[in-house]
UniProtKB/Swiss-Prot annotation:
The keyword Zinc does not apply. The keyword Mitochondrion does not apply. Specific class of high-redox-potential 4Fe-4S ferredoxins. Functions in anaerobic electron transport in most purple and in some other photosynthetic bacteria and in at least one genus (Paracoccus) of halophilic, denitrifying bacteria. GO terms for molecular function: 4 iron, 4 sulfur cluster binding; electron transfer activity; metal ion binding. This is High-potential iron-sulfur protein isozyme 2. Keywords: 4Fe-4S, Electron transport, Iron, Iron-sulfur, Metal-binding, Transport. Belongs to the high-potential iron-sulfur protein (HiPIP) family. Homodimer. It comes from Ectothiorhodospira mobilis. Gene3D superfamilies: High potential iron-sulphur protein. One of its GO terms (biological process) is aerobic electron transport chain.
C-alpha cells in the first residue's frame, strides 16, 4: 500500500513537534542543520522529497522536516 504523507496535525507528529520545514524550527533540542534526510530514523536515505521514517511507520515525512526524535547519522 502507498504510504500517506504525515500531517503536522497528526497527534504523534504534534507530540514530537514534527514540522515539514526544519528551517523555521525554534525548539530547544533542535541542532542547526538537522533534518529528516540526515536522521538515522529516516529509513531510506536515498528518498527524495518524502521518505519513510521508523517513528511514523504508516506515513512519509518531508526530507527537509524535523522532529524531536531526530538522531544524527553517525
Amino acid at each position: 500500500a502507498e504510504l500517506e504523507r504525515l500531517s503536522e496535525d497528526d497527534a504523534t507528529a504534534q507530540a514530537l513537534s514534527y514540522t515539514h520545514d526544519a528551517s523555521g524550527v525554534t525548539h530547544d533540542s533542535y541542532q542547526e542543520g538537522s533534518r529528516c534526510s540526515n536522521c538515522l530514523l529516516y529509513s531510506n536515505p536515498d528518498a527524495k522529497d518524502w521518505g519513510p521514517c521508523s517513528v511514523f511507520p504508516k506515513h512519509l515525512v518531508a526530507e527537509g522536516g524535523w522532529c524531536t526524535a531526530w538522531v544524527g547519522r553517525g
